[in-house]
Amino acid sequence: MAVNVYSTSVTSDNLSRHDMLAWINESLQLNLTKIEQLCSGAAYCQFMDMLFPGSIALKKVKFQAKLEHEYIQNFKILQAGFKRMGVDKIIPVDKLVKGKFQDNFEFVQWFKKFFDANYDGKDYDPVAARQGQETAVAPSLVAPALNKPKKPLTSSSAAPQRPISTQRTAAAPKAGPGVVRKNPGVGNGDDEAAELMQQVNVLKLTVEDLEKERDFYFGKLRNIELICQENEGENDPVLQRIVDILYATDEGFVIPDEGGPQEEQEEY
């Protein structure tokens, strides 16, 4: 039977979006680029098969699922596995299948803790287990470039920014030759431009997801701040500690003057 995990609070142990994708891709040998792609439920089903062999009817899991009713079917298989192994967790299927970042990110944070509590380190071949199937990729815009970010994602579990910088450094050597080739008019320049555009599209999606993640946590902090302000006159020491944490700044940090950023930009 499974070891249940009930903690859902945000802690320092929680992984960032990039680290979470790196863990999933490395563990299951997938090419996921967005947390939202977990909405199909297929990855969770395979993780359950890894943790508890035989708990999931993996042959029935649709790794190429692209429609909501297919996602729901996968989550039904996952629910059956949870029930079989005594996992005391309600899966918010109706929210997850919508493919929203916030809902999927919260659930995968819990699932990572559940995985860590139950994984015994045994060998597992994810590709053979799913008979070579790959998960369907929703954003067709970046489909040709999916193989490129896989290496930086799986090689970095400590630096969320590393996938971005790796792609930039990889593109730099090609930019020079690309400019030189324009003069002779060789067709290779078009291929190189297309490749660079693919990398730009991947970076744009990465920035978009980072902004969503930022707004998600900022919204939580803003709600906490409002609650503290509503109860400001109660002289609650716990409340005061929360306020102190909310407004704390790094040592040596100075709020810039209104003209500060403008002057810096001009010098730049």
From Swiss-Prot:
Residues 124-268 are annotated as: Interaction with MTUS2/TIP150. The modification Phosphotyrosine is found at Y124. Transmembrane segments: none annotated. Residues 153-169 have a biased composition (Polar residues). The modification Phosphoserine is found at S155, S165. Keywords: Acetylation, Cell cycle, Cell division, Cytoplasm, Cytoskeleton, Golgi apparatus, Microtubule, Mitosis, Phosphoprotein. Pfam families: CH (PF00307), EB1 (PF03271). Residues 232-255 are annotated as: Interaction with SKA1. One of its GO terms (biological process) is establishment of mitotic spindle orientation. InterPro entries: CH_dom, CH_dom_sf, EB1_C, EB1_C_sf, MAPRE. Residues 146-187 are annotated as: Disordered. Residues 208-268 are annotated as: DCTN1-binding. The modification N-acetylalanine is found at A2. GO terms for molecular function: cadherin binding; identical protein binding; microtubule plus-end binding; protein serine/threonine kinase binding; RNA binding. Composed of two functionally independent domains. The N-terminal domain forms a hydrophobic cleft involved in microtubule binding and the C-terminal is involved in the formation of mutually exclusive complexes with APC and DCTN1. Homodimer. Heterodimer with MAPRE3. Interacts with DCTN1, DCTN2, TERF1 and dynein intermediate chain. Interaction with DIAPH1 and DIAPH2. Interacts (via C-terminal residues 206-211) with APC (via C-terminal residues 2674-2843); the interaction inhibits association with and bundling of F-actin. Interacts with CLASP2, DST, KIF2C and STIM1; probably required for their targeting to the growing microtubule plus ends. Interacts with MTUS2; interaction is direct and probably targets MTUS2 to microtubules. This is Microtubule-associated protein RP/EB family member 1. The gene is MAPRE1.
